[in-house]
Amino acid sequence: NRQGNDCGTRYRTGIYWIDEADRADVEKVYEEVQQAYGEPLAVEKGPLKSFYPAEEYHQDYLVKNPEGYCHLSLSTLRLAKEYGEIMRNLIAGSDEEKKIVLPRFFKTGKGQYGEGDKFLGVTVPETRKVAKAHKEASYELIEALLESEWHECRLCALLILIEKYKKDPEAAVKFYLTHMKGVNNWDLVDLSAPYILGDYLVKHQDHSVLYTLAQSPVMWEQRIAVVSTLMLIRNGQFTDTIELAKLFLGTKHDLMQKAVGWMLREVGKRDEGLLVSFLNTHKAAMPRTTL
C-alpha cells in the first residue's frame, strides 16, 4: 500500500482491450473459459485505460519516483500494436531468397555504402501494399519505422509519408527534412525525394534547400538534392538540375555520379539541345560513370 495510487497488495487479475478487434477476442476467450470453468469468473474485463511496466516494481522504482507510478499513455500501446502489425505484414510478404540477395545488391558489407543495413526480404510492391493499408498512420509511427534497423520498415515509412504529403504537404516536407537520417540508401532516396521534396518545390519558388543539401557532408542528402529535381524536370524546370550537376562535376562517389547522369538524361529527353550544350562545355571534367 506504499505504491502511490496503485492497489498495493490487493492485486486482481484482468483482461483488457484497446480496440474493437481485441474486444471481440477478449469476449470470446472469456466466454469459453467461463463455460469450461463452470462458475462465474472473478477476472475483470474492459477497455484498457492506462498501464505501467510491472518490472519497474523490482528496480527501486519508488526510490526514483516517490510520487508513485507514472502511468504511460495508451497511445504508446497503440503505437506498439500498429508497429507490430506492420512488421508482421512485411514478414508475411518476405522471400527467403531475397533476404539473401538484397544485402549483397545494396552493398551492406563492411566499408560499403549500405554497411550494416538489414533486410527482411520484401519486394517494393509488397511493401507498397503494407504502406497502403497503414496510410493513416501517425507521424510517431512513421518516425519509429524510420528508426528501424530493417530496410523495408524504413521504406514503408517513406511510402506512408508520401500519402501524408498528399493531404498536408507542409507538414510532410518538414518531417522529411528533419528525419533524413533514416533515408540512407539509394532506393529510399529515389522512391521518396521526388514525390515529397521534389513535388513541393515544383509549387514553390524558393529552391535554396537543394543547395543546402548539396553542401551536406552526408552523401544521401546530396543525392536527395539531385534526385528531387526529377519532378522539376518533369515540369519543364531544368535550371536546378544543371546547377547541381555543375556542383557535382568532381564528385568521387559513384552513387552521386549515377544520380547526376540520370537527371541529365531526363533533361535531355525534354531538351536535347540543353543537354548537348552542357556536355560540350563540361564533358572533359565529368566522371565516366556520369557520362
Briefly describe each language-model feature range.
Residues 1-87, 133:
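Flexible coil/turn and secondary-structure edge motifs
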Residues 84-291:
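Alpha-helical scaffold domains
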